From Swiss-Prot:
This is Sensor protein LytS. GO terms for cellular component: plasma membrane. Residues 379-461 form the Histidine kinase domain. It is an enzyme of class 2 (transferase). Coiled coil: none annotated. It catalyses: ATP + protein L-histidine = ADP + protein N-phospho-L-histidine. It holds the Pfam family His_kinase. It comes from Staphylococcus saprophyticus subsp. saprophyticus (strain ATCC 15305 / DSM 20229 / NCIMB 8711 / NCTC 7292 / S-41). Member of the two-component regulatory system LytR/LytS that probably regulates genes involved in cell wall metabolism. Keywords: ATP-binding, Cell membrane, Kinase, Membrane, Nucleotide-binding, Phosphoprotein, Transferase, Transmembrane, Transmembrane helix, Two-component regulatory system. The modification Phosphohistidine is found at residue 390. SUPFAM superfamilies: ATPase domain of HSP90 chaperone/DNA topoisomerase II/histidine kinase. GO terms for molecular function: ATP binding; phosphorelay sensor kinase activity. InterPro entries: Bact_2-comp_sensor_kinase (IPR050640), GAF (IPR003018), GAF-like_dom_sf (IPR029016), HATPase_C_sf (IPR036890), Sig_transdc_His_kin_internal (IPR010559), Sig_transdc_His_kinase_LytS_TM (IPR011620).
């Protein structure tokens, strides 16, 4: 029995080794994180199907009470049986991929086991189906909860599934005496091995996923910390002063030897190692930077020759160069240098890419703000381009708080914040955008607000789908929703409802935002949207600004209409109906 246990342990070791190798492949990690998708499940079927085949033909032959340790079995004599790790592969496939994956793997494994033959081979197809159903059930419950079974639960399920196989051998065997002899010999080793193997397999998966989450949390925290400190400088444009301050902050917070920032031609700043010949206000001297600017893609170098610095004895051995963009045009580069090429890792590349995207957004936003002051409708565009700094820092603080608790949620909110600012930037360049884009902006805003105040309010949408292409002023609906969230409910924490509606009428596109809040006092109702109204929760300047934009774009008829009583408030406006496709056709005719 001990000999069989050791031999089975060797077979489990092979499966675990392959699993460990797979969990260090990025594609497999991605597949495990998306295991509920049908494409990933088909891939899991292929992988665990191969595992089950390996388990079958590397089994240990049992003949009576004799253990025969061969190498590979493609066929068994009628009186022989096979001790293997087949149950382990079926069980783990179910715990990871659910019943669909488990049943498919069970059929593959069971049919191949029947093909190999031996005593009562059909039993193992039957037991495989039972095992797949049980493990698949627990795997399905875990997937619904967006998690994996714990190691202890996995070990218990692994042992239970092997017990089920032993019961199937005893119940369905044609030769009860032979079945009892076989079970007495293999039961304890196989139940123990299956339990241990399942636990180890799950521990590899769980530890790898946990390590990935911790790495993402650290990266997100680093990006936020760097972004929070460097954001003010790039709004003023890409110049020597802003570049130097930002580079000094990056050098202090990252494990790099030097940081440089350039425009398309010159070095704006270089701080750290090799600053004696990488001098600001001089032309770019490295070929690597020139290639990054020309191609518009990230470039890496792991030797002085690849960097392309012509200065003799330059101590820089490795570099990451990321382009900075404004309106899809490369305007400069962010460069991270290392004196030891082995210091460069994947996290550094991800961090550099993230910083470059944030810096590019700030440069683009700053440029848009500058340009908006030079064009004819500067007043309207300046109102559109305003970004509430309190909202930004509240969002940053919310994301920072979530990093250690739920890194995946923090990553999603960071993407929503990026989408929010990108929409702000697009709105700063246009008097109107499509209703669909405006609703996307509202959803990004709501994601961030609901993260700050979970379950505080519920927003529902009643939108005529044929109106998605209608043109509306940027941030019009967002301002109305934001106004309702901030002012309608006061300190009420429950049953707060907001309804956003949009439909086409004879008079134009009708947009309304209503709430079930406390209502607006009668004495203030006539002033809202026309002038600043001072109160404990604000001044009403957002509605005033929106009203001014509506008047400027569409005339007095488009002004906000406000109806309020003790049961709630409705703010609406009716604007001329213009479709995005119609605007494109008219634009092409004008050309």
């Amino acid at each position: 029995m001990l000999n069989l246990f050791i031999l089975l342990l060797e077979r489990v070791g092979l499966i675990i080794l392959i699993a460990y190798i797979l969990m260090n492949i990025n594609h497999f990690k991605t597949m495990m994180n998306e295991r509920e998708k049908r494409r990933s499940q088909w891939q899991l079927i292929i992988i665990f199907g191969c595992f089950s085949m390996i388990s079958n033909f590397t089994g240990i032959q049992i003949r009576g009470d004799e253990i025969i340790n061969g190498t590979v079995y493609n066929h068994l004599d009628p009186d022989a049986s096979l001790a293997n790790t087949r149950v382990l592969t079926i069980g783990v496939s179910g715990l990871i991929g659910g019943p669909f994956v488990a049943l498919a793997v069970a059929v593959i494994s069971g049919m191949y086991r029947v093909y190999i033959g031996g005593a009562d081979a059909y039993i193992y197809l039957i037991s495989s189906i039972f095992i797949a159903l049980i493990s698949g059930y627990f795997g399905y419950k875990a997937m619904r909860a967006n998690r994996y079974p714990t190691i202890v639960k996995g070990a218990c399920i692994g042992g239970t599934t092997e017990i089920i196989q032993m019961l199937c051998i005893l119940l369905f065997s044609d030769n009860t005496e032979h079945a009892w002899t076989l079970v007495k010999l293999i039961a304890i080793p196989m139940i123990s091995i299956n339990s241990i193997g399942t636990a180890i397999f799950l521990s590899i998966i769980l530890s790898t996923i946990k390590q990935e989450e911790e790495t993402r949390a650290i990266q997100t925290h680093d990006v936020l910390q760097l972004a929070n400190q460097t954001l003010p400088y790039f709004r003023s444009g890409l110049n020597e002063q802003s570049a130097k301050k930002a580079a000094e902050i990056i050098l202090n917070l990252m494990r790099v030897s030097a940081v440089a920032i350039t425009n398309r031609k010159d070095i704006l700043t270089h701080v750290g190692v090799a600053s004696d010949h990488h001098v600001a206000q001089k032309a770019i001297i490295t070929n690597l930077s020139k290639r990054a600017i020309q191609s518009g893609t990230l470039k890496e170098a792991y030797s002085s020759e690849e960097i392309g610095c012509n200065h003799p004895g330059c101590p820089l051995e490795a570099a990451i160069v990321v382009p900075l963009r404004v309106k899809n045009d490369v305007v400069g580069t962010l460069k991270l240098y290392f004196t030891n090429k082995y210091d460069v890792n994947y996290s550094d590349k991800q961090l550099a890419t993230g910083l470059a995207e944030i810096f590019s957004s700030q440069l683009e936003l700053g440029q848009a703000e500058t340009q908006s002051a030079l064009i004819r409708d500067a007043e309207i565009k300046s109102l559109q381009a305003q970004v509430n700094p309190h909202f930004f820092f509240n969002a940053i603080n919310t994301i920072s708080a979530l990093i250690r608790i739920d890194s995946e949620k923090a990553r999603e909110l960071l993407l929503q914040l990026s989408q929010f600012f990108r929409s702000n930037l697009q709105g700063a360049r246009n008097n109107t955008i499509s209703l669909e884009k405006e609703l996307q902006q509202v959803e990004s805003y709501l994601s961030l607000e609901q993260a700050r105040y979970p379950d505080r309010f519920n927003v529902s949408f009643d939108i005529d789908r044929t109106c998605y292409g209608a043109l509306v002023p940027p941030f019009a609906i967002q301002i109305l929703v934001e106004n309702a969230i901030k002012h309608a409910f006061k300190n009420r924490k429950y049953n707060n409802e907001i309804i956003v509606k949009a439909h086409k009428a004879q008079t134009g596109l009708v947009i309304s935002v209503s709430d079930n809040g406390h209502g607006i006092p009668y004495e203030k109702l006539d002033k809202i949207g026309k002038t600043s109204v001072h109160s404990e929760s604000g001044t009403g300047s957002a509605l005033e600004n929106l009203n001014r934009r509506l008047d400027g774009l569409f005339g007095y008829e488009a002004s906000l209409q406000i109806h309020s009583d003790h049961q709630g408030t409705q703010v609406s406006c009716t604007i001329p109906y213009h479709n995005l496709e119609e605007e494109k056709i008219e634009s092409n005719h004008c050309r």
